[in-house]
A protein has these predicted regions:
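Transmembrane-helix bundle of Major Facilitator Superfamily
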Residues: 2-170
Length: 170
């Protein structure tokens, strides 16, 4: 009587102890997506209050919004190269740390210039975080679980814009 173990490569979810649930990787990436998606709507509604604290008009802070979006647009194409070159896990971890720290420092910014620079740094993290996170989930999720994993990644994009305005001071 042979007691051979099943091939782990055929059923990675079973090997990790997760049978039909959502993978930890998908949940972690979904949380990162939520942070990035909520960020835009929180800041957009907080701009008037931020402008008062900086002593400028709200329009002056639009440069921070534009700097973030431009950084995303320029660096997203490099995210695939970075994941291949340095490893998706390393890039995602780096991006998550950069994005989170830049978000915290944005909240503590004392000038418009500081805010804009921190938004650029935050954009660097965001540009790497979302595409590399999605790539990681797609590469590590078994085919039968792919729809559930993609749904897990989609929910933050739907919920965060609803929660952002009240959190930002709507």
């Amino acid at each position: 009587m042979s007691h051979s173990k099943p091939d782990v490569s055929e059923h990675p979810q079973e090997a990790s102890g997760v049978n039909s649930g959502i993978s930890v990787i998908a949940l972690l990436v979904a949380a990162a997506f939520f942070m990035e998606f909520i960020d835009g709507t929180v800041i957009a509604t907080a701009l008037p209050q931020m402008a008062i604290s900086f002593g400028v008009s709200a329009v002056d802070l639009n440069a921070g919004m534009s700097a973030y979006m431009l950084t995303l647009a320029v660096l997203i194409p490099a995210s695939g190269w970075a994941a291949e070159r340095f490893g998706a896990r390393n890039v995602f971890t780096f991006a998550l740390a950069v994005f989170t720290l830049a978000s915290l420092f944005c909240a503590m910014a004392s000038s418009v210039s500081e805010f804009i620079i921190l938004r650029i740094i935050q954009g660097i993290g965001g540009a790497l975080m979302v595409p590399v996170g999605r790539l990681t989930v797609l590469k590590t999720t078994p085919k039968p679980q792919l729809i559930k994993a993609i749904a897990t990644l989609t929910w933050p994009a739907l919920v965060a814009p609803i929660l952002g305005p009240p959190l930002g001071g709507f």
